[in-house]
Amino acid sequence: MKKILIVEGNLREENQSFTDGGIKTHTESLKDSIAYFTDKIETDVVNPSSDKNISEKVVDLEKYDGLIWGGSSLNIYSDTIEIRRQIEFMRECQKKIKKILAICWGLQVAVTVAGGQVKRCTNGSHRGICLLYTSPSPRDQRGSRMPSSA
């Protein structure tokens, strides 16, 4: 059985407000989605911003076949202890887990740890579908549009 670590990006207080409003957290939705498609994946959840025992998880990262780092209302431009804790945890994950799916906030953290730059959107926040641009090197700022067949 495959073992996946799911990282919760939101602060515990924000997740509580979702729960109080009858809305699933991002992590709960991810777990439900995985369970819908297969029962052959075991998941663990960690919240680097709120979990006091996060150092225990760092020691065991090699046991995971992959990692899913979900979204959050946070942004990489704020300098808070919670964000710094997530950046440090991602740094350890990138050393020890080879297969990482980073979604929205998770991608901001992953790019920052890898030495890339996340640029602030000049047209306000974006949600939904958009064109995806790739570059041959993380340092190449030009990029190119992915073929529509991708």
Label each residue range with its predicted role.
Residues 1-88, 92-96:
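N-terminal beta1-alpha1 cap of cysteine-dependent amidohydrolase-like domains
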Residues 70, 141-144:
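Conserved residues at the C-terminal ends of beta-strands
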Residues 70-132:
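Cysteine-nucleophile active-site neighborhood
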Residues 133-140:
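Conserved small/polar residues in nucleotide/adenosyl-binding loops
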Residues 144-150:
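Hydrophobic alpha-helical segments, chiefly the membrane-spanning helices
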